[in-house]
Amino acid sequence: MRSNWIRFLAGVLVSVALVGAFAVTGGMKGGRSTDGLLYQASGLHPDGEMLAISGQTVTCEEYLFWLGMVCDNVTASLPDVDWSAAVTGDGMTFAEYAKTDAVEAAKQHAVVRAWAQQAGVALSDASTLELDAQRQQYVAYYGSEEAYLQQLALMGISEEAYDRILEDQYLYRDLYQAFCTPGSSLYADDATLTDYAAQLGYMGAYVLKLTGDNAETMANDLLERWQAAEDKEKEYALICEELQQTADGIVTLTAVEDDALSDAMSALEIGGMTAVIDPYGEGTSFVVLRTEPDLSAVAETYFDVLWNQKMEEATVVTNSKLYDGVDVGAFYE
C-alpha cells in the first residue's frame, strides 16, 4: 500500500497530539462496499462506520485515508520503521501511535462539521468557487479528468470522500470568518469579548513609529500636536499621511514583561498619550495613544479558544471490532 499513498494534499496537516480515552460501541455498521484499494489493504468495507465524533460519522474510508497519511509521515523519518516497536515510555507502539493520530486527524474534521451544523454555517459561495478552481488545478496537473480520478483511486479514496475532506478546510475558514465578522450570527457579543480581553490583558493603541537622527525630536513634537488635536483618530491619519506611513489603526496586543514600550503603554489610562524614546536602543521612538482593544481582533483569538474547547469536549466513539482489527503494518506495506 505504501507506494500508492501519493501526497498531493498541500495544506492537510495531521496533528501529532495523541487521542485520549474514548468510548467504544458494537452498534455501528460494518459496511458492505468492497470497492477500492483500502478494502484490499485492510479488509474493511469503505462504507463501514469506524468512528462517531460529536455526532458526525467517520467512515472506514476516511479513517484509513488519515491512517495512510500518518504512516507516510512516520516513514518519511523512519523508512524502515518496525510498527510493533515501542515509541513511548509507556509502551505505545508505532502502530498504536499511527492509529490514534489518525483518529485525531479525523476528529479535527468531524468537529468542524459538527460546529458548522450547530451554527447553521454552510460552505460559502466564494469557498465553493475556490474548491472548484482547486479541483481544476489538480486535473490540469495530472493531465486529464481521468488521470486525476486514477490518482484518487491509487490513494484508495473515492472522489466524494476526498471532496468532503477538502470542503472541511474551507468550512473551517468560513466558520472563522463568520465568527470574526461583527453582526454575524456567530460573532460573540461585545461584553463577552471585553471580558475575555480583560482576562488576557489585551491593550489597544494607535502607534506612530519614528526613525532617523531626529526621531526623538519628532516624537516629542508629534505628541504635543496630537494631544492638542480635538479629533485624535483624524489627526493620526493625517500624521501617517505626512510621514508616508500606513495608517494601521488600532493595534491590539498583550503586555510583554520587561519590555519598555509595552510597559509604557500599560501605564497609560484609556485616552492617555506618551512618547517612548528609543526603548530598544536602536534609535527608534514611538508616540502612543492608548485605546480600548479592537474587539474584532480579540474575536480572532477567542475563536481559537473556543475551537480548542470544542476539540477537548468532543466525544469519540469507536467501532471497536473494526478499529481493533486494523493491522497497520499489513495495511501500509
Tell me the role of every PLM-derived stretch.
Residues E61, T93, Y97-A110, A122-L129, ...:
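Soluble non-cytosolic domains of exported or imported proteins
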Residues M1-E96, T100, D263-A267, E313-E333:
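Short, low-structural-confidence N-terminal segments
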